[in-house]
Amino acid sequence: RAVQLGPVLDAILPRHDYPEPVAALLAEAMVLTVLLGTALKFEGKFILQTRTNGPVEMLVADFATPRSLRAYASFDAERVAAAEAAGRASPAELLGTGILALTVDQGRHMQRYQGIVQLDGTSLEDAARSYFRQSEQLPTEVRLAVARQLVPGDGAREHWRAGGLLAQFLPEAPERMRLPDLPGGDGDEDVGHDPSVAAGADNHHRRRRLCLGIRHRG
């Protein structure tokens, strides 16, 4: 599954004049929220929230089916500026340690479901992979990409673009038994490992990532 965001980022991110690394981190949270929310095939809200001790203390992204998206970041401006000056403003460094909560809300007459993942100096990508390892125990790859791009014919203005990719093996897929190096795989770490198969899978994922554009659909 792949999702791509464009104008919605331009509509949300400039409202609060976020520093660029904070805006990029919030864009990652937004695309991950839409990626997971649209994968669930439900009606209601999917909410992503972080609470951490890093310069970005909280992220909230709220996706309501079918197409509504809201997001907000709470941060310490001085700590963010210091992190930028020290060259330590990666997503994982801005988050620090804490928790990532993923909530499914299908309305007041339905039970809410929530999953909690520890953030220990990890990125949102890493936390999402940990979530799937804990909850579904399936080999899962999550990739997120965020960038600002100049759009031709628009007065050389920069626009935010983001993309996300979620790839999983089916539970009975034979490749699952042959790829011991994938998180959640069933193969023995030392027996029956064919490097050519693993390399082929890695090339496949790389092609998928390269094919993932960062433009808005719809």
Regions found by a protein language model. Name each.
Residues G187-P195, N203-R206:
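Alpha-helix boundary/capping motif
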Residues R1-G185, A201:
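Interaction interfaces in information-processing and related assembly proteins
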Residues L212-H216:
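Short, intrinsically disordered C-terminal tails of secreted or membrane-associated proteins
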Residues R207, R217:
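Short Cys/His-rich Zn2+-coordinating modules
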